[in-house]
């Protein structure tokens, strides 16, 4: 598993409350053909927080099946409890994915020790490599560099998606973590300076719409062509601003639908369709980037969850996990 380069945090296509498999497969093929290093399913951009565990497993399984090993498939693992995270990991065991993106538990606001126990417990109950995911603006808790350095000692914890947007944080992580521990930014607007501070790549929202430009920017950075990288960064800035004008993934899912990458911009409640002003901003950004698109009204959000074909059942109450995580009580 190589957590380096451009990983696209893809949207989850939906139709009438259910996962749209045809659009999902088409989206994965388009990303593979663009040349990205990997695809992340059911993260923040993939609406993992509103999907059932079975839906999340289904999306990951379909993505892995469509990719056929041509790119790495990373499944998002988000939860409020460690047990729920473990239950999802168990469902994902035979899905064909290459790794896990495990986010800090939301709402509970665990201490540093609690976060460490959470991640180590997950690591002890999977055979897949793990990328930590720190996004305090969504989860309400910030995984500190000292904790990351401790977690990086575990053989299966090999990377972090750092989405604070802090360049100081990037420097701290590079100084405290092993050289082979991958640092990925989860904040598109700061990708260029993050890479300059020792980053290894990005997990990107922008690359849903502009994978070629993101790949060119990272290639320019790697080649030391910083002027060219800066030009590409400036070209992508209006799009990045438009994609975060409202809560992600509302704008990017709309953009994917306008571009014909997915059949519908349908969201899962409580997310709601893009506002008129944000839609105008998005249209201007796509035009500036030279994209041809057909602007259309977004459908109403669905309640969900939908039925999952070939549903794999797992009774959470009967699952047993190893809690001997090596962390002092």
Positions of PLM-derived features:
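Low-complexity, intrinsically disordered or signal/transmembrane-proximal segments
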Residues: 312-313, 329
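Glycine-biased, low-complexity coil/linker segments
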Residues: 303-309, 321
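Ser/Thr/Pro/Gly-rich low-complexity, intrinsically disordered segments
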Residues: 298-300
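Alpha-helical structural signal in soluble globular domains
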Residues: 34, 58, 62-67, 91-95, ...
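Catalytic alpha/beta core domains of metabolic enzymes, predominantly
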Residues: 138-244
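Active-site beta->alpha loop and helix N-cap motifs at the rims of alpha/beta catalytic domains
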Residues: 2-8, 12-15, 20-140
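C-terminal alpha-helical cap/extension of soluble enzyme domains
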Residues: 5-11, 34-36, 203-206, 210-296, ...
